[in-house]
């Protein structure tokens, strides 16, 4: 039976979950991107307009609402829906502080004795300057309320950056050691009490090959993470996921939804946790969902109605790998820049669009400066998925096309 599902948000991860759910259900999205119109009914309601969204849901008999965007999760939408007996799959606002308050997240990691890079939190510029004097290069600087982070190998450059952060009225700055290793994400689904793994990924955050350039929201991914052993997954469940759920419950904010962990896996097998995710990331959502063999509506709803703990014993995954590649445009031009070759791709290849991509008057998708497309392919091995991904990437054409050429390009 087809259900009506509302997704809140318009980035690549919202596109990925909406497209996956549209295979079986009727999808509504707000404030949808232009590309989503091909498979969803697109609305024009602000993602933090909780009362207006609730009114739409009640008037249109929506079966399930899934707030994904940060702005939506920071609003009171979950509490408002619960008060009005509407089915919503997401954590309450106070439980989400783990993701949106980076300084708080580091303090909680320390409190729960979860391994995390050595760090300092600073509200005064001079104290931050003193801290980096004795740090070994490289190190990472990030702000309290931002997902971006910058790696520094030069103290003087870092001081200039810290100057700019405090000039911009950032209240707190976080400085932490840089950990060498493989970045990973590990995702679970939970009703607040029981949690089950739903997927993992190797993520590539640096903009250039060989992990050079700036840290980004992601340039590619592979799922499942073939470097993460079963024992390490057990470790994450027992020492990160469940302590986090216990903490949220003790604080009076049981965490219901997708609970993800971002971390670093070192060469000697140690795990360092960088922070939590309230959903999948733009760069890995399509890959993780491609491997997931579940009716997401039934899975999500079981958490909301209270049947998850009793009825769901495990999560089914396809016996395959999926790899994703972010295609960016490096041209800052206002001229038309049609994306060509999409019709030539294999029918099993998944295309996920960023919200910057719109259609021109000829009904062609157009590339804009920055991230545009996530191309995802699958195979029985990670290497087969990756080889196919790069072959497909060559078929897509637009001016200024750029992508990393080393995603999963090492011994598997």
Short names for language-model regions:
Residues 149-286:
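Internal nucleotide-binding/catalytic subdomain
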Residues 237-260, 277-349, 358:
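Active-site "cap" helix and flanking loop/linker of ATP-utilizing ligase/carboxylase catalytic domains
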Residues 144, 317-319, 365-370:
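Short, flexible turn/loop "capping" segments at secondary-structure junctions
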Residues 1-93:
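ATP-binding N-terminal substructure of ATP-dependent carboxylate-amine bond-forming enzymes
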Residues 89-150, 156:
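A conserved helix-loop-beta module that forms one wall/lid of the active-site cleft
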Residues 358-362, 366-412:
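Generic C-terminus detector
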Residues 153-155, 188-190, 327-329, 375-379:
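Short beta-strand-to-loop capping motifs
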């Amino acid at each position: 039976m087809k259900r009506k599902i509302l997704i809140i948000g318009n980035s690549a991860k919202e596109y990925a979950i909406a497209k996956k759910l549209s295979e079986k259900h009727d999808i509504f999205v707000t404030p949808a991107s232009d590309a989503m119109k091909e498979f969803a009914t697109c609305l024009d309601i602000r993602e933090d307009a909780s009362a207006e969204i609730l009114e739409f849901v009640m008037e249109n008999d929506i079966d399930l609402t899934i707030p994904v965007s940060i702005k939506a999760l920071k609003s009171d939408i979950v509490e408002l829906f619960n008060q009005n007996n509407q089915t919503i799959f997401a954590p309450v606002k106070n439980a989400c502080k783990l993701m949106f308050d980076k300084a708080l997240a580091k303090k909680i990691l320390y409190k729960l004795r979860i391994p995390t890079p050595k760090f300092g939190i600073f509200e005064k510029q001079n104290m931050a300057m003193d801290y980096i004097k004795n740090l070994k290069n490289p190190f990472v600087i990030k702000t309290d309320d931002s997902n971006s982070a910058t790696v520094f190998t030069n103290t003087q450059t870092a001081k200039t950056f810290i100057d700019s952060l405090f000039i911009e009225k950032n209240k707190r700055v976080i400085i932490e050691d840089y950990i060498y290793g493989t970045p990973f994400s590990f995702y679970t689904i939970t009703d607040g009490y029981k949690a089950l793994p739903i997927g993992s990924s190797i993520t590539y955050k640096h903009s250039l090959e060989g992990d050079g350039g700036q840290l980004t929201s992601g340039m590619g991914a592979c799922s499942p993470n073939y470097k993460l052993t079963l024992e390490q997954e057990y470790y994450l469940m027992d020492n990160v996921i469940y302590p986090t759920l216990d903490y949220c419950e003790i604080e009076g904010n049981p965490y219901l939804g997708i609970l993800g962990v971002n971390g670093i896996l070192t060469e000697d097998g140690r795990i360092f946790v960088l922070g939590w995710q309230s959903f999948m990331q733009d760069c890995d959502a399509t890959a993780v969902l491609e491997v997931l063999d579940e009716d997401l509506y039934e899975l999500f709803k079981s958490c909301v109605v209270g049947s998850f703990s009793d009825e769901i014993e495990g999560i089914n995954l396809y016996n395959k790998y999926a790899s994703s590649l972010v295609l960016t445009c490096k041209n800052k031009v206002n001229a038309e820049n049609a994306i060509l070759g999409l019709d030539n791709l294999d029918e099993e290849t998944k295309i996920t669009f960023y919200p910057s991509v719109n259609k021109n008057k000829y009904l062609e998708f157009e590339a804009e400066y920055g991230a545009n497309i996530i191309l995802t392919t699958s195979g029985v091995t990670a290497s087969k998925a990756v080889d196919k991904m790069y072959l497909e990437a060559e078929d897509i054409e637009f001016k200024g096309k750029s992508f990393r050429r080393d995603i999963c390009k090492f011994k598997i």
